[in-house]
Amino acid sequence: MDGLVAQCSARLLQQEKEIKSLTAEIDRLKNCGHLEDSPSLDQLREENLKLKYRLNILQRSLQAEKRRRPTKNMININSRLQDVFGCAIKAAYPDLDNPPLVVTPSQQPKFGDYQCNSAMGISQMLKAKEQKVNPRGIAENITKHLPNNEYIDRVEIAGPGFINVHLRKDFVSEQLTNLLVNGIQLPALGENKKVIVDFSSPNIAKEMHVGHLRSTIIGESMSRLFEFAGYDVLRLNHVGDWGTQFGMLIAHLQDQFPDYLTVSPPIGDLQAFYKESKKRFDTEEEFKKRAYQCVVSLQSKDPDFIKAWNLICDVSRAEFNKIYDALDITLIERGESFYQDRMKDIVKEFEDKGYVQVDDGRKIVFVPGCSIPLTIVKSDGGFTYDTSDLAAIKQRLFEEKANKIIYVVDNGQAVHFQTIFAAAQMIGWYDPKVTQVTHVGFGVVLGEDKKKFKTRSGETVRLVDLLGEGLKRSMDKLKEKERDKVLTEEELTAAQTSIAYGCIKYADLSHNRLNDYIFSFDKMLDDRGNTAAYLLYAFTRIRSIARLANVDEEMLQKAARETKIVLDHEKEWKLGRCILRFPEILQKMLDDLFLHTLCDYIYELATTFTEFYDSCYCVEKDRQTGKVLKVNMWRMLLCEAVAAVMAKGFDILGIKPVQRM
């Protein structure tokens, strides 16, 4: 097979060279000006047309050959069916520009496995050209032009022109075997492409609170998704580590720990330390003046003040890392301070191109289509968030050479980022058709009273307290089910952590990120419905089926290579198709950046598995002795495929399942 592809490729290259040579010769003859009726020119034209025709056939053959080559990757069936129907529509209606191509999974078994719903749209296009054609007739014409393929068993036309597609059972069985033998692999969709994901971004000297939870969880999951798709992902933590607040913190540090340069100050509670310094800043005029002097010294890079700044950042960083480690978050810190030296050049570039206006001492930039201007220099000469965000986006585009930049920041910052992106386009830093820069917004976390999530005293909920409460609640739930009497201490702790952090993450990710969501430990720890608790329990049950039947990993691998997966029962067929939709789900998320789609899919997979398991015996036992009489190996393989897909889905969501719960 490889030899044939290589041979086709070589012929293709040779014919492309011949076409270039002939085209050059035709151009030369045209330029002579007196060879309009030259037989030489006519002969060359004819030869060129023949070569182009043969080249077109070769290109199509090569593409088809590559499609037929065995691959270790999971196939996106929806995408393959779109290719097939795209060819059919082009052949049936060659004169239509960009006809609609709509292929979706069927919602009910009676409508087949997939549906092509293009006929109605094509009917409208033909009507606009004053050609009246019934959509059903269009559907019939499309089906007549379907090319030979390995995916479709048969098609049916239903209603006004829906084309119901039934997949070949052998094809589905082969794809499931491929998944089991080679693991879950995607084609290298992001090969040689770089994605930057900017998320979490807490402020130094302030504790992380529930408001940071969504950005951190969504950003981590999004990073994992792009990494799995083969992208080079840079995860950035744009912490607030610069600004006037450091003046008051350093001044307070000098007063509280005068020997801080030689003895590391024991700042136990940085939040309390911040509040004390803020109180002094607001009430003591002398302290306020000294705080401003400290800012000037810090900005001029005085070594003693840089050391004080580093000490404060280190204390904060240690607290942040406790939360990141608990939630298995990976980030590279690159705060506002990183961009300070670039800001003067940013201002100069906007000035040189005539975009800067002065308003009450401020330097502002109006951006077309945006109602609020950017302030790039304050009236006191200082820079702003606008300046640092412009410096950041330029660095990411020109130095990091990112193909995609994703900012995971709450919906309240939507206008700010729209303006930053528009300014970057206006000044010529990037073309949105080439580089994708996206604000991934999200709603706020609400309490059960449907107001912003607060403590009983009305304060913002500290993230460390929230995680601690989650651990306590999950242990209570496990003990309520008497799992402490079955699991070892190590297994119990692993289950506690898996449930606590998994439920917190899943409760966030399972909602459409644009919406606010209600935080409720009771709901997220419920082991019924679309919750992490239910899915984690389902996963451990699936994993236990082989174990209880005394089927080990080696036996499963041998069976995957040698046993054909039979899909004769309707529940086997439904489960097999559901498993193979995984690449489609991932592609949709890569396109629209909505992660709840994956949560919905994993839940659908788990419930489809339950239907299968209730109807199809995987293991047959003696009812009296419990002795295993028969193991239906192809069904065990279906169990294994479900577990493999769920495990990868959990990994993308940042959830760690356990083998026993």
From Swiss-Prot:
Its EC number is 6.1.1.19. A motif ('HIGH' region) lies at residues 202-213. The modification N-acetylmethionine is found at residue 1. The keyword Cell inner membrane does not apply. It is an enzyme of class 6 (ligase). Pfam families: Arg_tRNA_synt_N, DALR_1, tRNA-synt_1d. One of its GO terms (cellular component) is nucleoplasm. Residues 1-73 are annotated as: Could be involved in the assembly of the multisynthetase complex. The keyword Manganese does not apply. CDD domains: ArgRS_core. GO terms for biological process: arginyl-tRNA aminoacylation. L-arginine binds at residues 201-203, 212, 385, 389, 413. InterPro entries: aa-tRNA-synth_I_CS, Arg-tRNA-ligase, Arg-tRNA-synth_N, Arg-tRNA-synth_N_sf, ArgRS_core, DALR_anticod-bd, Rossmann-like_a/b/a_fold, tRNAsynth_Ia_anticodon-bd. It is found in: Cytoplasm; Cytoplasm, Cytosol. It comes from the Eukaryota. Coiled coil: none annotated. Residues 530-544 are annotated as: Interaction with tRNA. Interacts (via N-terminus) with AIMP1 (via N-terminus); this stimulates its catalytic activity. Interacts (via N-terminus) with LARS2 (via C-terminus). Monomer. Part of a multisubunit complex that groups tRNA ligases for Arg (RARS1), Asp (DARS1), Gln (QARS1), Ile (IARS1), Leu (LARS1), Lys (KARS1), Met (MARS1) the bifunctional ligase for Glu and Pro (EPRS1) and the auxiliary subunits AIMP1/p43, AIMP2/p38 and EEF1E1/p18. Interacts with QARS1. Part of a complex composed of RARS1, QARS1 and AIMP1. Belongs to the class-I aminoacyl-tRNA synthetase family. The alpha-helical N-terminus (residues 1-72) mediates interaction with AIMP1 and thereby contributes to the assembly of the multisynthetase complex. Forms part of a macromolecular complex that catalyzes the attachment of specific amino acids to cognate tRNAs during protein synthesis. Modulates the secretion of AIMP1 and may be involved in generation of the inflammatory cytokine EMAP2 from AIMP1. This is Arginine--tRNA ligase, cytoplasmic. It comes from Cricetulus griseus. The lineage of its organism: Eukaryota, Metazoa, Chordata, Craniata, Vertebrata.
